[in-house]
Amino acid sequence: MDGQETSGPGPGYPPYWEADVVLSDGGTAHVRPIRPDDADRLVTFFHRWSAETVYRRFFTVRSELTPAEIERFVNVDHHDRVAILAELGGEMVALARYDRLPDSNEAEVAFVVEDAHQGRGLGSVLLEHLAAAARERGVGSFLAEVLPGNRQMVGVFTDAGYVARREYGDGVVRLSFPIERTELSESVMRSREHRAEARSVERLLVPHSVAVIGASREQGSIGRRLLDNLLIGDFAGEVYAVNAAGGEIGGHTAYRSVCDVPGDVDLALVATPAATVLDVVEDCARKGVKGLVIVSSGFAETGAEGLALQRQVVATARANGMRVVGPNCLGVINTDPEIRLNATLAPASPGRGRVGFFCHAGALGIAILEQVEARGLGLSTFVSAGNRADVSGNDMLQLWQEDPATDVVLLYLESFGNPRKFGRIARRVARRKPVVAVKGARSLTGPPAWLAGSGVRANDTAVDELFRQSGVIRVETLTALFDTAVLLAHQPLPAGRNVAVVGNSAALALLAADACVASGLEVAVSVDVGAEGTAEEFREALGRTLSREDVDAVVTVFVPGLTQPEPDLAGVLSDVTFDATKPVVSTFYGFLGVAAPGSVPSYRSPEAGVQALARAVEYAEWRARPVGHVPDLEVDLSVAHAVLEQALLEQPDGGTLSAEETGRLLASYGIEVLPTVHADSADEAVAAAELAGYPVAVKSTSARLRHRTDIGSVHLDLHDAGSVAAAYEAVAMLGERTVGVQPMASGVATVVGLSDDASFGPLVSFGLAGVATDLLGDVGYRSLPLTDVDAAGLVRSVRAAPLLFGHRGDDPVDVDALEGLLLRLALLADRHPEVVGVELNPVLVATHGISVLSATVRVQPSPPSWDDEARRLG
């Protein structure tokens, strides 16, 4: 192929189409557009096809590609002719392409997957990426011709969630289908993403063989501790020691390289110096290792050079089918008695339990594991991700969603890699099981150094809203995390907010009752068995209280050392609540934890127990709410695309849209802005008012003054020419010679906005208009995607919301129309990443309908975000 190959990606190459992807078996591959220098790879790829694969692709038998075909296949324009390949270990293993038909928005497509990699989901992944590229380039439909016997390829198209039309003729099946995103295609993609990413993490946690690379003879060294912990924990599979010097370590043969290990290696624990890790990863690729846990330090936490090395290590691993935990991490644990994996630096593994735990910090992980043991929690699985260069909390949520061994999920997060994906997955997981999270690094102005390049620090308000919207229980400290976890792991969820207090100390009962009120709970009854109460009296009081229909949960408080020793009361508590359907928490002063699985958690203070209970109540209420959906709204995408494309041609660096552009863009999404006529004199203002019809409003057009009713820059409800002229002169006295004249609209004044948060992407905001709202910060936020339930919650989240619902005898306003506006704005933001800011201020909400009086839209050039278009890691 010498002489035909052109170096480099070629003109128009879209680098943001590149992605690492997870396949259906949990392995990884790299997806990218084809390049002219792929000619040799293409020929080698073709020569690995079976005769059947060749026939299915070309409908004929052939042994070679012609030079003209090769030239055409690798030279594309990335617009009307697009080809996307998947590569593994630097070799092409699958290829998909489309060719647009002349003067059409239809394109013919063709796919081929190498025989050795068929059945791994490569076809469906490439279809997602090819369709995303096609939509970006204005292609609306795909056409494909497939042999009737090629059921796998027919399935790639028909199982993707698209509605395909089939025709039979000339011995082939002709398929045609629109490629617009639909609820079904989105659901199919998310389901495949979930299964693939869960499987990729499962390969790390359920290995049949483990190699410790960097195992050492030196007691206490990192490599030796990893090896010893595997052996002490009685790992169920094969353990191999790898040391460059060879010999023997702890009675085990030490192999000089992982490539020398006689058996297969599923998981490699890497504990070699940072400078050697890339070579180790390449050896693991040659060996066929399925996953890596890199405990070595010296990467992103050390600065720019370490970050560059870390990225190279992860890219090499992913390109060769491997996921990575770390680097700079503590390791992973799986307490399944069939696995018994302690691949960490921690001296002891916690007992078996129903809790899955993910954390960032390596060193902190040891303290966390000690607390887990002290609280009697027990774990199903544990992952310390360190620098979190690859495997993240999102991956673990994918695994834990359907993991029958995990009932409660705990997260200690210091940054987010992909917050939008986190919100989407967490919302799904939290519908099944509680997710409790500590968001650390609040005091930092940026991401922690050890997470440089792999995440960004989110503003705290956005974090709160993301967690609340996703059903994640946010706590401030690790202590609160464990307080909440022991309750959720051992007690049922409360059905309501009514709490009973039962105990032998009036003082403690009062503290518990006060804590309930402070936490938003209702005290239904308080039962005091007295300081001299017996265990049987307590048994009877607790049983009677639990049977009350007006009680949803019970808080028990005890001072030890009275007539009954503490163990007797604890036993009674466990007996009475064994099959209870209501949660019970207790305070035994001097005792913390749980006696056994299913027993009642005990806290050092009533306040701690009540706060944990309150969190469980809020979570149960969230879970009981409808899931909601993103409604299918009618919009004019062609107009929106045209407005934005023209605006960015005129302002290549971005900027604010003109009033005319703003009106057209918003109208394409069903958001009408009340027309405004600008006037530069009193006579022009009167003429504009006569044209609009009285009453009218006259206001300054200055961004500084146009909302300042307090200083005379806004004049409302003007009914005649004289008042309009006077209003113009009043505004002119402020130094503004141009005013806006609008038809008068009425309603409660609100502000709707869209901002592009550096961490979370687009956030939709809502608040009531006015200085008081600004001063109090009474603004609510929601991240995308926005469901109808989210929109309703956003409107009701602000403290001033009662003004919308008939406050003090006023008529309630049209909240449905307001929620519809929020949904349309959210859809605009979701479809057009170029739109980075919108302010609708004010939006008047009347008893029937809404009026948008003023709108500002900011745009900036931005390559499409494919987070929601096609599966990708990162």
Q: Which residues does each predicted region cover?
A:
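Long, contiguous binding/interaction regions
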Residues: 2-203, 207
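Catalytic-core regions of core metabolic enzymes
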Residues: 180-874
